[in-house]
């Protein structure tokens, strides 16, 4: 999950900050980031929102970091 770690660092966030933003326990987040644990759809959504990116970017389906426009 290099993409996830790189984007988190690019945003200047620690794993503890990600815990606060996503509600995902820091130890679980660390396992997700190192590939020792998969994230659920809901966790992926929370991570994407916290990092201001798309779930597609996190999944490696696109190289575009900017999220799609949000539906109002």
What are these regions (language model features)?
Residues 3, 14, 40-43, 54:
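Residues that mark the N-terminal boundary/hinge immediately upstream of a DNA-recognition element
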Residues 23, 42-57:
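DNA major-groove recognition helix of helix-turn-helix/homeodomain DNA-binding modules
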Residues 1-10:
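A short, Lys/Arg-rich alpha-helix, primarily the initiator
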Residues 8, 19, 48:
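The alpha-helix within a helix-turn-helix
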């Amino acid at each position: 999950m290099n993409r996830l770690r790189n984007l988190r660092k690019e945003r200047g966030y620690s794993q503890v900050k990600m815990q606060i933003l996503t509600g995902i326990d820091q130890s679980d987040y660390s396992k997700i980031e190192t590939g020792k644990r998969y994230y659920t759809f809901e966790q992926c959504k929370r991570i994407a929102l916290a990092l201001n990116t798309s779930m597609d970017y996190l999944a490696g389906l696109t190289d575009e970091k900017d999220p799609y426009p949000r539906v109002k």
